[in-house]
């Protein structure tokens, strides 16, 4: 029998960011974005830095994620992120100030990583 929903849990070390039934996900994988629909094949993958999109009906919820893992099995999706943030938890003005400070740094891999993380949080907060 085919299911029409996914049971999703998004967990960071700090808290449970989301738990519930959803229609679909768009996930920032370490090698690019991918979609998850009900009855997806079993999957384990690593997460990159980006916006996790959770769709339930006409509603879209965005969560900033910074690395971690996803497991999909039997319409249950477990997402464990190294760090995640909900829109309501992000101080957009503080993130914009942090972005200005990061942009002053000399070019490096760590600067690029900080830029990506900060821009992702700003994107989630502004949606």
Curated annotation (Swiss-Prot):
InterPro entries: ATP_synth_F1_dsu/esu, ATP_synth_F1_dsu/esu_N, ATPsynth_dsu/esu_N. It is a peripheral membrane protein. It comes from the Bacteria. The keyword NAD does not apply. One of its GO terms (cellular component) is proton-transporting ATP synthase complex. Signal peptide: none annotated. Its main location: membrane. One of its GO terms (molecular function) is ATP binding. Keywords: ATP synthesis, Cell inner membrane, Cell membrane, CF(1), Hydrogen ion transport, Ion transport, Membrane, Transport. Pfam families: ATP-synt_DE_N. F-type ATPases have 2 components, CF(1) - the catalytic core - and CF(0) - the membrane proton channel. CF(1) has five subunits: alpha(3), beta(3), gamma(1), delta(1), epsilon(1). CF(0) has three main subunits: a, b and c. NCBIfam families: ATP_synt_epsi, PRK13444.1. Belongs to the ATPase epsilon chain family. Produces ATP from ADP in the presence of a proton gradient across the membrane. This is ATP synthase epsilon chain. The lineage of its organism: Bacteria, Pseudomonadati, Spirochaetota, Spirochaetia, Leptospirales.
């Amino acid at each position: 029998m085919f299911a029409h929903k996914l049971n999703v849990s998004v967990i960071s070390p700090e808290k449970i960011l989301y738990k519930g039934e959803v229609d679909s996900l768009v996930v920032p994988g370490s090698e690019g974005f991918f979609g998850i629909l009900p009855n997806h094949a079993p999957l384990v993958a690593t997460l990159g830095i980006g916006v996790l999109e959770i769709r339930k009906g006409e509603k879209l919820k965005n969560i900033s994620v910074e690395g971690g893992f996803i497991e999909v099995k039997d319409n249950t999706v477990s997402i464990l992120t190294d760090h995640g943030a909900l829109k309501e938890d992000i101080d957009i003005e503080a993130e914009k100030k942090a972005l200005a400070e990061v942009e002053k740094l000399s070019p490096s891999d760590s600067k690029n990583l900080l830029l990506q993380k900060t821009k992702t949080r700003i994107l989630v907060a502004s949606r």
